[in-house]
């Protein structure tokens, strides 16, 4: 039970750090983080479309983030690395944050969702799903789903191949939850066969039957 409590505590801590970094690094195109314990302390990898913003002028911002992760969140000797997101349109976290920002700017939820889906698919995604939950049009909360293309929903492919991201939009009517799921262009399903070129081969009489 002690081990279970430890992992629950660590999971909650990582979630709180993710929420903090999302707010601090929205202008950097924040796309999530990875936390790993090492013999020397804690390695924190921040994924961002604009690494320069995370680092800051003269390294000022990354030093401040390091201090906060250690003092406020209790990470042992945090070492921050920043990894650039090559294509932000295929990172679900980046897209969730951008969609939340669009909603906060007053763009209608349907227009914002369709615009995001078109941009994601134009960048080669095999499929995308967007779920918006909250008071979208009035006092009554509801959930709306938008999708296009193919997206693995269950099993190992859904867990390992699909990029998922979550963000929140703070509106006058309340908080809107934004969930984005993206199937990237290079996702290969276990039972999928892809033939790029026409193949010609001889077949024996027995095989032909």
Curated annotation (Swiss-Prot):
Cysteine disulfide partners in this protein: none
Keyword Nucleus: no
GO biological process, one term: translation
Pfam families: KH_2, Ribosomal_S3_C
Cellular component aspect of the GO annotation: cytosolic small ribosomal subunit
Sequence ranges assigned to domain KH type-2 in this UniProt record: 17-86
Highest taxon of source: Archaea
InterPro entries per the UniProt record, alphabetical: KH_dom, KH_dom-like_a/b, KH_dom_type_2, KH_sf_prok-type, Ribosomal_S3_C_sf, Ribosomal_uS3_arc, Ribosomal_uS3_C, Ribosomal_uS3_euk/arc
Keyword tags: Ribonucleoprotein, Ribosomal protein, RNA-binding, rRNA-binding
Single GO MF descriptor: structural constituent of ribosome
Subunit structure: Part of the 30S ribosomal subunit.
Family: Belongs to the universal ribosomal protein uS3 family.
Biological function: Binds the lower part of the 30S subunit head.
Protein name per UniProt: Small ribosomal subunit protein uS3
Organism field: Thermococcus kodakarensis (strain ATCC BAA-918 / JCM 12380 / KOD1)
